[in-house]
């Protein structure tokens, strides 16, 4: 089946699909203060989703393209779940968030099919994959249309990988007690086995969102990158997120001696946001298998245990947490009790001495990850490094921070 035909099959016009903002039924906190963060974007009045311009631009989307799609959503007069929120149009039609971003992705998909230059075609496929992922954002469980967009993103990503520099292998990993999971191993030019970074992504992202990290930072240094989806989304959708948050990544780590392209004696983990929860757990539980662990904006304690901090977080992000935990109908009180169990300090890990070198990067006044969380990580390590990343200029400092983190990882791997 061609890519175009697959799109038509998946996205037949229907209007009974549940609208994304209705999937998690929590009691609302009411009015919330505006939130802005480098990794998560910011709350904008009249939008349910956080608008994450920095990360979307970093992944290769033109700012004008973002504004164009937003404008189409705003201008729609179709029925909405909440008339006050632009991105709550019901059904797969004009104005619906998933429809508009997927439509934009199909434009690039068609460009990719028409392009004769393999590298340029690969770029177009990658662009389409990124747009399909934005269509599926924030990847809530039970969002049928979003899951269809994710399927198209994965297909486009595989097409891109066949044409872009280096090599990518789709790999299946067995996990006892449940379904196998699929990961992508990105390898630079040259002969392996390669030193490798195991990517632990955020809860509102897919594993295919991190190609820029590999291409700009790891590949030029001869480092491979292995990604898997976080529990409950994408290729890991059959696994629920539990307090043993690092379960899937641990099984992948244990399988690496059997992967011929990976030098299993030179492996590091890199965690974004909640992915840092996974990475730091690995630092404690699998220290013989890891040379280093790096974190960026870690969610390891405060957000999970501090009610005041949770009150500052946008509704969408709390919906993401509830969705990952399988608590779609839970009260806020029940969600708070459960989140507390995910704190690595409450679990008795953070605060204990850890032999694995750990770096943690943070932004001042980050509503999701205060400086104290990063200090807790680095002070627990026998070889800790704290990295403050200035907020403005946001894009340049984000790039500089990633360069410093990659330097630090490279010294411990190579």
UniProtKB/Swiss-Prot annotation:
Reactions listed under catalytic activity: a carboxylic ester + H2O = an alcohol + a carboxylate + H(+)
EC assignment: 3.1.1.1
Signal peptide extent: none
Gene Ontology molecular functions: carboxylesterase activity
The keyword Protease is annotated on this UniProt entry: no
Enzyme class: hydrolase
KW Hydrolase (keyword) present: yes
InterPro entries: AB_hydrolase_fold, FrsA, FrsA-like, FrsA_esterase
Entry's family note: Belongs to the FrsA family.
NCBIfam families: PRK05077.1
Protein name: Esterase FrsA
Species name: Escherichia coli O1:K1 / APEC
């Amino acid at each position: 089946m061609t890519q175009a035909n697959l799109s038509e099959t998946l996205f037949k016009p229907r209007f009974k699909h549940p609208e994304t903002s209705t999937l998690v039924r929590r009691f609302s906190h009411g009015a919330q203060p505006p939130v802005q963060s480098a990794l998560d974007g910011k709350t904008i009045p009249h939008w349910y989703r956080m608008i994450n311009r920095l990360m979307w631009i970093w992944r290769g989307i033109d700012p004008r393209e973002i504004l164009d799609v937003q404008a189409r959503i705003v201008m729609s007069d179709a029925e909405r779940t909440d008339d006050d929120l632009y991105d709550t149009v019901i059904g797969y039609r004009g104005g619906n968030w998933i429809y508009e971003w997927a439509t934009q992705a199909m434009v690039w998909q068609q460009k990719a099919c028409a392009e004769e230059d393999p590298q340029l075609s690969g770029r177009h496929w990658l662009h389409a994959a990124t747009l399909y992922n934005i269509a599926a954002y924030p990847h809530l469980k039970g969002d049928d249309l979003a899951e269809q967009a994710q399927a198209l993103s994965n297909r486009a990503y595989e097409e891109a990988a066949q044409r872009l520099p280096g090599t990518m292998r789709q790999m299946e990993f067995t996990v006892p007690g449940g379904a196998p999971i699929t990961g992508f191993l990105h390898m630079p030019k040259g002969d392996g086995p390669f030193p490798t970074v195991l990517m632990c992504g955020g809860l509102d992202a897919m594993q295919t969102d991190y190609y820029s990290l590999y291409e700009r930072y790891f590949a030029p240094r001869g480092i491979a990158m292995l990604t898997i989806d976080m529990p409950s989304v994408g290729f890991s959708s059959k696994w629920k997120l539990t307090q043993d948050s690092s379960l899937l990544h641990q099984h992948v780590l244990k399988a690496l001696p059997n992967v011929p392209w990976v030098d299993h004696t030179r492996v590091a983990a890199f965690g974004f946001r909640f992915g840092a929860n996974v990475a730091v757990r690995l630092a404690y539980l699998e220290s013989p298998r890891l040379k280093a662990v790096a974190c960026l904006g870690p969610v390891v304690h405060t957000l999970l245990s501090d009610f005041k901090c949770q009150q500052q977080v946008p509704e969408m992000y709390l919906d993401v947490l509830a969705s990952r935990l399988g608590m779609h109908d839970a009260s806020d009180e029940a969600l708070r009790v459960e989140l507390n169990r995910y704190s690595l300090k409450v679990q008795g890990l953070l605060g204990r001495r850890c032999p694995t070198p750990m770096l943690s990067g943070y932004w001042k006044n980050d509503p999701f990850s205060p400086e104290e969380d990063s200090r807790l990580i680095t002070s627990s390590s026998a070889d800790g490094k704290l990295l403050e990343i200035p907020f403005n200029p946001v894009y340049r400092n984000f790039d500089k921070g990633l360069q410093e983190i990659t330097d630090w990882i490279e010294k411990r791997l190579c």
